[in-house]
């Protein structure tokens, strides 16, 4: 089993000058991580976790949290982190990828040589020693065995944790400056001194030969740990300055950490080449070579190097003025530069819709693009809002005392409407064209009046919560480009905040127009905060998931009051649209009893369970008007959930699905009456021949509100390929007017998608959206197709790669067989080779017969029966064995087909079979 520890060793860079020892029992009831965080802000340079009563699992969890705090403070490369006594826990944590730099052991703990053998040569090992004689014995240890010594106590203390770094001999003896210097001179290792240390000791300690001081209570027990740490650090530096101690010699005398040696056998030593595996037969060697080649292709296809080089985000400045202000709107687009056509001239760059957003530091978040637009209208107010509490992040956060990775970037006070709804629908209905509408019109290449009128009629929605000013306005409606949503979010089983932010960035890079955070696991509130502050696209949620987490997954404990509080919490954070399963009514639940797959919607099943347990109507339905009033204050759009959607083809279009749809039509009108934007969620599994019926039924029942569908999947037989089965249905339903398609990844029905699954799902659905736009005859929909076709015909290979939705996969597949750079200028690919390339042959035909005048002359002569020079050449080619064919007219083709059909029928054949047959 290989060592998974990914971090560089700190054995040559740790700083003992401000060494903070801490455990949960030292923090006076405050969260351990909060105290560590404050100590780091105050200048602590070394952290030791000491929790004598904790078991290995608890210590590992604490270590993970402390390592995350150090990372959040951007000090992972400057502040070392060790665990007291438990080398076994350090070993386990490092194998889990947690940044624990080493262990500190006492005289009664693990023998130093054993600790070094267990942890390997990269870990820090510290050792306690209280006397000069003990230090001299430690010097006899093999070179490279330990890295520093902890000596103490400086003062008599009744609390054992402060007696010394690693433990006390119980003698009660203390150290003075002379004794400290004696120990330091005797030691071959840097020495850190502590035990009852306070700020008053700093000048004396800094004047000795000690490398630094260690402390527990003076910081952990202080009213303000940050200020206490800062005072001590400044006192030390006033005498010592920034001068650092030296390091023990690094002599590698041990093997790597236990259990890694076997995994590293045969691996290359530093500075040497890896030894290739030898094979006993040619077949094994060829198979290994093929596998290695395929792995290289797969790795290249999973990246974005070529895409990032070719797809450049730019902005177009659009002046905008209305009664509330004047602005220069910087509207984004993607520019793809194209090469020249050989012998003809330059090709203009291709401009495409951009969803990626500007680059930013994820820890700081995006700039609030729309904040001035929102404030200048004068119809909102700032207010304090509800206070976030640990319950918002779930039961594990309550136990831990904090989220695993707190948001420390830009903070904002929540805003809400003052006197009237502040939705884009309200403005549109009052004839006000907002900056958001002009921004969208520029992105869509359409007239702004089309945007306003579609919003006013409810045929389009613009999800843009005033508390998410970072989002770039976009529109969802059948009159506009078909949009794509990507789902993500953690679960109770897997993922982290960093992974979810990375998935967000990855999804928008490849073209996601909106993202839904469907987190159901750890840190729901904080994960959402990170996502919102970093998202250039609207964010949707299902608030029921967080509400259920707050009642520890017991649906019977849900209430309207708890749900309302959760909705307001998310409105204040900036969620742009919310899935509300208000159409799952008590009387509809029995209709699902005989389904093959029952109720597959998580939100729908939660509400069905609540209705049955209480035998009451859904509080989402009975309090729907109150939800409308809340949404109108923040401009949050409804995504009316299809809680009774079919989860298999066998259940499609049944009474439960259609009954819920009728209720969603009623709720749409109720929301519109309060100027709240609405879109309707659609079915997930539908036979292909009923896809069109579903969209047409939704339009009729829900008054042309935008339809938002998951796929639909058109077969249930392809786990692992449901991004394909669903993209087929998505293209068809998009063709007939579905406004937004929710992607499906290869992991659908199988597990939580990772980064590569997200890319696969987004690309599949970008293709579906684009195909639907072409089928709808959307203006300019075929521009990209025409550009790439022209590049293909002209053998401009790089332009072909760059104009594709996934340049990295395209170039990886091409280079799989033709990797040489000259092949990217060749007039063939590996499919046909240089002699049989249809494009090359077609170019020769164009050279011979191209030009409008030549074409007209050929047609004229052929119609007149004249054997032109061109026709004579064609006949000569046939005579010489060159494959050719006479071109039949449409009439001749039809006549020939009829004749063949008659012959087939006369022989007893049947052209078509009935369903019974």
UniProtKB/Swiss-Prot annotation:
Annotated binding of 2-[(2R,5Z)-2-carboxy-4-methylthiazol-5(2H)-ylidene]ethyl phosphate, by residue: 157-159, 196, 216-217
CDD domains documented for this protein: TMP_TenI
Residues the record lists as binding Zn(2+): 685, 749
Binding residues annotated for [4Fe-4S] cluster, in chain numbering: 829, 832, 837
Biased composition (Basic and acidic residues): 274-290
Residues annotated to bind 5-amino-1-(5-phospho-beta-D-ribosyl)imidazole: 487, 516, 545, 581, 601-603, 642-645, 681, 708
Pfam families: ThiC_Rad_SAM, TMP-TENI
Binding site for 4-amino-2-methyl-5-(diphosphooxymethyl)pyrimidine: 48-52, 84, 128, 160
Catalytic activity, reaction form: 2-[(2R,5Z)-2-carboxy-4-methylthiazol-5(2H)-ylidene]ethyl phosphate + 4-amino-2-methyl-5-(diphosphooxymethyl)pyrimidine + 2 H(+) = thiamine phosphate + CO2 + diphosphate; 2-(2-carboxy-4-methylthiazol-5-yl)ethyl phosphate + 4-amino-2-methyl-5-(diphosphooxymethyl)pyrimidine + 2 H(+) = thiamine phosphate + CO2 + diphosphate; 4-methyl-5-(2-phosphooxyethyl)-thiazole + 4-amino-2-methyl-5-(diphosphooxymethyl)pyrimidine + H(+) = thiamine phosphate + diphosphate; 5-amino-1-(5-phospho-beta-D-ribosyl)imidazole + S-adenosyl-L-methionine = 4-amino-2-methyl-5-(phosphooxymethyl)pyrimidine + CO + 5'-deoxyadenosine + formate + L-methionine + 3 H(+)
Enzyme Commission no: 2.5.1.3, 4.1.99.17
One MF annotation (Gene Ontology) recorded for this entry: thiamine-phosphate diphosphorylase activity
Region (Phosphomethylpyrimidine synthase): 271-917
GO biological process terms held by the UniProt record: thiamine biosynthetic process; thiamine diphosphate biosynthetic process
Region Disordered, annotated ranges: 256-311
A GO cellular component annotation in the UniProt record: cytosol
Names of required cofactors: [4Fe-4S] cluster
Keywords on record: 4Fe-4S, Iron, Iron-sulfur, Lyase, Magnesium, Metal-binding, Multifunctional enzyme, S-adenosyl-L-methionine, Thiamine biosynthesis, Transferase, Zinc
Region (Thiamine-phosphate synthase): 1-243
Record's cofactor remark: Binds 1 [4Fe-4S] cluster per subunit. The cluster is coordinated with 3 cysteines and an exchangeable S-adenosyl-L-methionine.
Binding locations of Mg(2+): 85, 109
Pathway in which this enzyme or protein is active: Cofactor biosynthesis; thiamine diphosphate biosynthesis; thiamine phosphate from 4-amino-2-methyl-5-diphosphomethylpyrimidine and 4-methyl-5-(2-phosphoethyl)-thiazole: step 1/1
Role summary: Condenses 4-methyl-5-(beta-hydroxyethyl)thiazole monophosphate (THZ-P) and 2-methyl-4-amino-5-hydroxymethyl pyrimidine pyrophosphate (HMP-PP) to form thiamine monophosphate (TMP). Catalyzes the synthesis of the hydroxymethylpyrimidine phosphate (HMP-P) moiety of thiamine from aminoimidazole ribotide (AIR) in a radical S-adenosyl-L-methionine (SAM)-dependent reaction.
HAMAP family tied to this protein: ThiC, TMP_synthase
Family: In the N-terminal section; belongs to the thiamine-phosphate synthase family. In the C-terminal section; belongs to the ThiC family.
Protein name stated in the entry: Thiamine biosynthesis bifunctional protein ThiEC
Gene responsible for this protein: thiE/thiC
